[in-house]
Every structure is written in C-alpha cells, then in structure tokens.
Regions:
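Short, conserved charged micro-motifs
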Residues: 176, 254-262, 309-318
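Conserved glycine-rich beta-strand-loop-beta hairpin in the small C-terminal domain of fold type I
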Residues: 221-223, 237-249
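PLP-dependent enzyme catalytic core of the Aspartate aminotransferase-like
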Residues: 273, 285-374
C-alpha cells in the first residue's frame, strides 16, 4: 500500500485514467483518492468461471488501444498489469500478452507498471501453461516478465515473507521522480520505514521465490482443493489459480441479491459450521458510487486462501468435507447488511449482521447432521 501511495502521488492527477487488466481493492482506493479512474480491460474469458482458458488475467489488447485513443495518452500516466490477478480468482497473464501490452505502451509513450505481489505464482503457471516457456526456470521467466515493465512494485508479505514492500525500476528518470516521496511518507531511501531485519528476511524470501519446489506447493494444493470441490458439484473458478481456491458464491447463493452480499454471507456461513475463514471478494469489497449506491461486483467469490508451507493435505480435506456439506444446504444461507459502514475500504473494518435468523437455522441443521462437532 505504501508503494501504491507513492506511485499514485507521483503520477495521478484529477482526470487521470489507469488502464489495467483488473483492479485490486487498495489500488482502486489509492487511484480514486488522487482523482483518477480505472479502466478494467479483461477479455470475456476472465469473467467466465467455467472457462478453462489458461490466462484469464490477460489484458484485452484491442480495448487497451481503443481506451488510449478515446481518453488520450496524455491522460494516462501508466498502464498497470497485475500478476496472478487477485479478484478474479488468482488468474495469470501470459508473457505474450505482456509483450503486446508493452508494444502498445511504446507506441503511445506510456509507462508499464507491474504489480508483482504474486509474481512467482504467475511465473509458475506460465511455466506450466505457456508452451514457449515450458523449459525455462522460474528465474528466467521472472526476468522475462520484469524486463517488459518500467516499474515493478510488490507487497513483500505476498511475494516474499515479511512485512513491507518495494518499488523497482531501471530507469533513472523514474527513480528521480519517486525519490523525494520516500522520506516524505515512509523513511529514508536506504530503508523506507522498514527495519533492517525485515529487509534481510525479504531478501531471503525473494530468492526463495525462484525455487520451484517452494513456489509450487501452494498452487498444487489449490488445484487439489478446486478439483475435489468440483467433484462434489461445488461451483468453482476454473482453471485453478493461485493464492487460494475461489468458490463461485454468485451461483451457490443465487437466492441472495447482490446488495445483501452473497459472497460475504457464504464466507460467514462457512465459518459458522467449520471455523474456516474465507475471504469475501465481491460487492462487499467494492466502494459505493458517488451517489451512495452499491457498485455491484462482476463476480461474487469466496477465496479459500492456501498460504505456502502452512497446511497439510488433511486440513485441505477438512475444507472439502465442510464446504461440500454447506453446498448441499446452501438454501439455508441468507443475506447480510451493514450496521457500521466505513467510507473507505469498508470490508476491512465494517460491521454486519444477518438480515434474518438464517444463522440459527443453519446451525440447527448442522447439529442435527453432525451433533456438537465443530
């Protein structure tokens, strides 16, 4: 978030437009805070949860050029590409697509910014799915990706292993533009508000990102979880992405209107019957519009995150068992409403309550089936 704030402060002004494959919550908040707007330019496959298209995070090249022509290159300070696109199910882009984005950017003299927070996992899926790179190491793939960007920024908690983040560039002009903002907002250039201990841990974590044995553990477990839940009929985002298995709450909770937050309700129901914490990625994660109306999400997902080197396979199987039961009893799930709604990033700190007594009915059915087991 600190990196996003620095970049937005440096480049975004009122009227700026940032084309991207898809937004992330804090990215959108920072851009709008500085007066900019976002243009999301996925191909249709990116929103089709049942499509087996391998690179749903690809940016729509024709729409990108059309957007630049319509709004003017002078109003577009950079094009943002997110690795392992988070909010559509951790879906990767291909290097070929990034090359095409780079070519358009060069044509109109616009910079390319790569959100590399989930770079290692995107590289691993390129290794598996993009024929040209099947014999490349993760390090070679990551270099090919970063060579196509002017600026690379990341959350170390996602890419590496520690608190903090970073902004990288091999362009001295860009470095000089960003340089004075670091001590203003974070700390001196040599540490940026991060302790030396955390920087050392970050360096180790970045090297580990090049280790296929380490980086593949999470995607492999996620693929197992997606396939196992799919075998039970649970609607999932396919093909399996990274970061977590993503459950299609729009389909499971079709009886819940989007303004009652079906993904949030499904996550709450899962926690009640299992203690499993899923993350809502849908309308609840969006900001209201300028008139106070809900901004309905393109997708309603519950992310079942699978961190690296944390879970055993038996724990993944427990998730399958409880999620499968909940799917069979999905009609018992009801909606949610806010009792406290912060004006920004409401899903972090807001408070909600059920719109009816559906939690009691759900738990009564669970106890009838399982006894007092939780």
């Amino acid at each position: 978030r600190a990196a996003e704030n620095i970049l937005c402060h440096a480049y975004i002004r009122k009227g700026s437009l940032i084309p991207m494959n898809y937004h992330f919550t804090t990215t959108m908040a920072h851009i709008t805070q500085y007066g900019g707007k976002v243009a999301e330019l996925l191909y249709d496959e990116g929103f089709n949860v049942d499509s087996d298209y391998p690179f749903k995070g690809n940016m729509h090249i024709e729409k990108l050029e059309e957007t630049i022509k319509t709004h003017g290159a002078e109003n577009i300070p950079f094009i943002r590409v997110e690795a392992s696109t988070n909010l559509i199910g951790g879906q990767p882009f291909s290097i070929q697509n990034l090359r095409e984005v780079r070519a358009i950017a060069d044509k109109y003299n616009i910079r390319v910014v790569l959100d590399a927070s989930l770079l290692g996992e995107n590289a691993y899926l390129i290794h598996l799915r993009e024929e040209e790179f099947k014999d490349y190491s993760l390090g070679e793939i990551i270099k090919a990706m970063t060579d196509l960007a002017d600026i690379v920024y990341f959350s170390a908690r996602k890419l590496s292993s520690s608190r903090g983040g970073g902004i990288c560039t091999n362009n001295h002009e860009i470095y000089r533009e960003l340089e004075p903002l670091i001590p203003l907002y974070e700390g001196f250039l040599t540490y940026g508000g991060i302790s030396v201990r955390e920087i050392e841990a970050m360096a180790v974590g970045l090297y580990e990102t090049l280790d296929e044995t380490m980086i593949r553990q999470s995607p492999d477990f996620i693929a197992y979880l997606v396939n196992a839940l799919d075998a039970h009929g649970v609607p999932m985002v396919k093909p399996a992405g990274v970061l977590g298995a993503h459950v299609n709450a729009m389909e499971i909770c079709r009886h819940i209107p989007q303004n009652e937050y079906p993904a949030g309700a499904l996550a709450a129901a899962l926690f009640l019957i299992s203690g499993i914490r899923g993350m809502e990625r849908g309308t609840l994660s969006n900001q209201r519009d300028e008139d106070g109306n809900e901004t309905l999400a393109d997708m309603e997902l519950v992310r079942l995150a699978v961190p690296r080197r944390v879970f055993t396979l038996s724990q993944i199987k427990y998730v399958v068992d409880r999620m499968a039961w909940l799917y069979e009893n999905r009609e018992l799930i009801g909606g949610l409403r806010f009792v406290y709604e912060p004006p920004v990033l409401r899903f972090f700190m807001g408070g909600l309550e059920p719109v009816s007594d559906w939690p009691q009915k759900l738990m009564a059915k669970f106890k009838a089936d399982f006894g007092e087991s939780l």
